[in-house]
A protein has these predicted regions:
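Conserved catalytic-core segment of NTP-binding enzymes
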Residues: 13, 22-23, 42, 110-189, ...
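N-terminal phosphate/diphosphate-binding loop that engages ATP/GTP or pyrophosphate donors
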Residues: 4, 18-85, 89, 94-97
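Hydrophobic anchor at the beta1->P-loop junction of P-loop NTPases
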Residues: 7
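NTP-dependent small-molecule kinase module
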Residues: 181-215
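P-loop NTP-binding module
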Residues: 96-107, 131-133, 214-215
Length: 215
C-alpha cells in the first residue's frame, strides 16, 4: 500500500508542476518508487510530459491522470465543453491503481486549492476522499504572504493537514524573499521546508523531512 502526498498551489503559474517533479526526482534518488497523479489536466496533458522531464521518470502517461482535456479551462468547464464530467469514483479507482505500482504517490492539485471540479465536487473533496496530507507551493515574490496565508487558512479550516510550504523562485539573500518566508511561517504556523531557486534541478531538503511528509 502506498503512502501519499498532495501538492497544493496558491494559484496557477506558481511552479507547482516543476516543484512536484523535483519532489519525485528526490524521492527516486533515495531509492523510493514514486509515482505521479493528477485528477484532471487541460492542454492535452502537457503537465504529465513536464513532470516526466523534470523528474526523469518513465511512468506511463495514461496512468498519471484519468481526465485529460484538450480545453484549457477549469476542470468543470472543460468537462462540460467536452461532455466528459468528472466522477469521484473514477478518480479514486485510478489513484488506487497507481498505488499498486508505486510505494509513494505525489498528487498535484489543479490551479489553487479552491478549485471546482464539477458543480458538486471541489478539489478538497478529492483530497479528503483519498486521505492525503498536503503541502503548499507558492511563488516567493510579490503577493506571497497574502496567497500563502489565505491558502493555508482555507485548508486548515477545511481540516486539511498542511505539513509544509515550499517557496519557488526564491532568491537567497533577497530581503523581500527572506521576509516573505519569515512572515509565512509566523502567520500560518506552517514551516517552510524548502526553497527552490530558478534553475534548480534538485530539491534541497532534508531526507527525513521529505519522508515525513508522506507519513
Amino acid at each position: 500500500m502506498s503512502v501519499n502526498l498532495f501538492v497544493a498551489g496558491t494559484g496557477t503559474e506558481v511552479g507547482k508542476s516543476y516543484v512536484t517533479g523535483l519532489i519525485i526526482k528526490k524521492l527516486n534518488s533515495l531509492g523510493c518508487a514514486c509515482g505521479y497523479f493528477k485528477a484532471t489536466m487541460s492542454d492535452s496533458g502537457e503537465d504529465a510530459k513536464r513532470i516526466k522531464e523534470v523528474a526523469g521518470i518513465t511512468q506511463d502517461e495514461a496512468t498519471m491522470c484519468p481526465y485529460v482535456y484538450k480545453t484549457e479551462a477549469l476542470p468543470y468547464i472543460a468537462g462540460r465543453v467536452e461532455n466528459n464530467p468528472v466522477s469521484l469514483d473514477v478518480i479514486k479507482d485510478a489513484f488506487d491503481r497507481v498505488g499498486k505500482d508505486f510505494d509513494y504517490i505525489t498528487m498535484e492539485g489543479s490551479s489553487g486549492i479552491c478549485c471546482p471540479i464539477s458543480d458538486e465536487l471541489m478539489l478538497e473533496d478529492i483530497v479528503g476522499t483519498l486521505g492525503l496530507h498536503s503541502i503548499i507551493v507558492a511563488d516567493a515574490g510579490v503577493g506571497c504572504i497574502n496567497s500563502v496565508v489565505l491558502t493555508a487558512s482555507y485548508m486548515i479550516m477545511r481540516d486539511m493537514h498542511v505539513k509544509g510550504i515550499i517557496l519557488n523562485h526564491f532568491v537567497d539573500g533577497d530581503e523581500n524573499c527572506e521576509e516573505n518566508l519569515r512572515m509565512c511561517e509566523l502567520l500560518t504556523g506552517v514551516p517552510v521546508i524548502a526553497k527552490v531557486k530558478d534553475g534548480d534541478t534538485d530539491l534541497e531538503i532534508d531526507e527525513d523531512t521529505l519522508l515525513m511528509l508522506y507519513a
